[in-house]
């Protein structure tokens, strides 16, 4: 009789217990999946890689004389970065930036089926990007001398995930595709050819694999990110040394060193 009288309280105890068990199960499952994801390769190697950002001095951004020599200044800056002690290789790129949440996303379709559009993350990169981030193709090969926006068809590298989605599991090397969103632009680029297929890619350790495409970058500008691979014995204190040594040296024309991080 006492249990019957306390039946409402007992029901709430069971409800609370079920809620706690569900939350506990969810937490364990979440941690497990994070750990599994963290052990999977991102598809590219960011260890010993530092990201360098430039910016324009506000007082000089409207100086037409200085800005007309922008390419020369940036070339000097890039050369100084390449020559800095401990730097093994340098590159520049823009689009989807690892670990920042700054992503560029568009769709591509194979010429064989223009209705089959696959969305993917994009990176526009210089030829040395693949050395800095140690990208090794699964099939095909990277040809630096052909990595040019003016090459026709324009060469691209794709992650395995994108290649499989676009070309129905066929080896994507040598296949062609186009970006339907560019068709109405002044100078539409209608033909991309897959130079090589890369391992599956993630934006960081804890994300799932997503379709990725790499395209040749335009010449270096201030909005590009510059990445450098640093020798292992130069890693300790590299950020602080670089900022101290290069803050003044990279202040060329309207540009200055904005940030460096690993």
Pin down the residues of each PLM region.
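Short beta-strand segments
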Residues: 16, 51-54, 90-94, 119, ...
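Generic structural signal for small/hydrophobic residues in well-ordered secondary structure
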Residues: 34, 52, 81, 87-90, ...
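Membrane-proximal extracellular/periplasmic loop immediately following the first transmembrane helix
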Residues: 31-116, 149
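Short, strongly hydrophobic transmembrane alpha-helices
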Residues: 6-36, 44
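Hydrophobic secondary-structure segments that place a key small or acidic residue at a functional site
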Residues: 116-210
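Acidic-histidine catalytic/liganding microenvironments
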Residues: 6, 81-85, 169, 249
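"Rare, low-scoring activations can occur
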Residues: 82, 153, 160-162, 185-262
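A short amphipathic helical element positioned immediately N-terminal to and/or at the very start
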Residues: 1-4, 77
């Amino acid at each position: 009789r006492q249990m019957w009288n306390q039946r409402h309280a007992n029901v709430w105890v069971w409800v609370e217990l079920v809620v706690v068990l569900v939350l506990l199960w969810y937490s364990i499952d979440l941690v497990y999946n994070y750990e599994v994801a963290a052990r999977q390769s991102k598809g590219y190697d960011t260890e010993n890689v530092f990201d360098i950002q430039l910016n324009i001095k506000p007082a000089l951004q409207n100086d037409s004389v200085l800005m007309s020599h922008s390419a020369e200044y940036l070339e000097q800056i890039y050369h100084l970065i390449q020559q800095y002690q401990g730097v093994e290789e340098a590159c520049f790129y823009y689009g989807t930036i690892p670990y920042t949440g700054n992503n560029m996303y568009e769709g591509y379709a194979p010429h064989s089926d223009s209705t089959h559009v696959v969305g993917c993350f994009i990176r526009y990169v210089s030829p040395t990007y693949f050395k800095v981030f140690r990208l090794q193709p699964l099939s095909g090969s990277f040809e630096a001398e052909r990595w040019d926006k003016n090459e026709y068809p324009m060469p691209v590298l794709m992650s395995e995930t994108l290649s499989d989605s676009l070309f129905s599991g066929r080896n994507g090397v040598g296949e062609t595709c186009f970006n339907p969103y560019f068709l109405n632009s002044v100078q539409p680029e209608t033909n991309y050819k897959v130079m090589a297929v890369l391992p599956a890619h993630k934006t960081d350790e804890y994300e799932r694999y997503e379709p990725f495409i790499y395209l040749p970058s335009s010449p270096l500008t201030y909005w590009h990110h510059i990445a450098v691979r640093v020798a292992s014995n130069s890693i300790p204190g590299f950020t602080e040394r670089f900022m101290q040594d290069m803050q003044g040296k990279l202040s060329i024309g309207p540009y200055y060193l904005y940030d460096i991080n690993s």
